[in-house]
A protein has these predicted regions:
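Non-catalytic, conformational "gating/processing" segments within enzyme and secreted inhibitor domains
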Residues: 1-58
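Conserved active-site loop region of the serine DD-peptidase/beta-lactamase
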Residues: 80
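Flexible, low-complexity segments enriched for small/polar residues
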Residues: 40, 44, 48-75, 83-229
Length: 229
């Protein structure tokens, strides 16, 4: 028990939460309340829905939520069991292109594709591979982890990321690094498009028909199929 409990700030007396009255010692009441909330069926459903929305689909099927919720209840919330249930739900119920990539994951996917180090400044000419520059890019992309909105954190919904402003930020970032970073790495957007979309497909031809190297990179990395998983 690593909980610190301040008796000075505690409101004395009995406390009733969700129809149950807690009469124990103040610090024990807190632990008892937390355990009851964790065991409540509504808690497992809430957690299961949020996990399914993050990994399966913005509007996940009821079966996916129930699979995760059942694992939570059966194991008492054991993380390893719940995580395995999430994987099973993804395998069984997710479809290709169901989830839109948040900026952070999209950024990592871009640099994984070009096999390049992370990353250049979002604005500027100097190479700098330390943490602050990565934070600068994530901030410009609108997804700096330490600035997540409260109380719900970053949204898992595509509608919150698919806005003109947020798309413009991604376009500008690809436009910047394509001029030097991608060329230096020997990255070929047309070959990558053939591998990702299928040689001869409409999407691959769309990338191949780009008038410039920069434009080809933008068409590839800002293509709907690249930005979804």
């Amino acid at each position: 028990n690593n909980t610190y409990f301040s008796h000075k700030g505690n409101e004395p007396g009995h406390h009733t939460v969700m129809g149950k009255t807690y009469k124990q010692d103040p610090s024990k009441k807190l632990l008892s309340l937390c355990k009851d909330l964790a065991r409540d069926p509504k808690t497992s459903l809430h957690i299961a829905k949020r996990l399914a929305q993050h990994f399966v689909a913005d509007d996940p099927p009821r079966e996916a939520i129930e699979l995760i919720s059942h694992a939570y209840n059966r194991s008492g919330g054991t993380l390893a069991v719940v995580h395995q249930a999430v994987i099973d739900a993804v395998v069984k119920f997710s479809r290709e292109d169901d989830k839109f990539l948040q900026p952070e994951i999209w950024l990592f996917q871009v640099h994984k594709a070009i096999q390049g180090e992370l990353p250049l400044k979002f604005v500027g000419d100097t190479d700098d591979h330390n943490g602050p520059q990565l934070n600068s890019i994530l901030s410009e992309l609108g997804h700096l982890n330490c600035r997540s909105p409260q109380p719900n954190g970053w949204s898992d919904m595509a509608i919150d990321w698919l806005t003109p402003e947020m798309m413009d930020r991604r376009l500008r970032y690809i436009g910047q690094i394509s001029n030097r970073k991608m060329r230096e790495s020997g990255f070929d957007p047309k070959k990558y498009a053939d591998m990702l979309f299928g040689a001869g497909s409409n999407s691959a031809q769309f990338v191949a028909s780009a008038p410039t190297y920069r434009n080809a990179c933008i068409r590839l990395f800002c293509h709907p199929k690249f930005m979804r998983t």
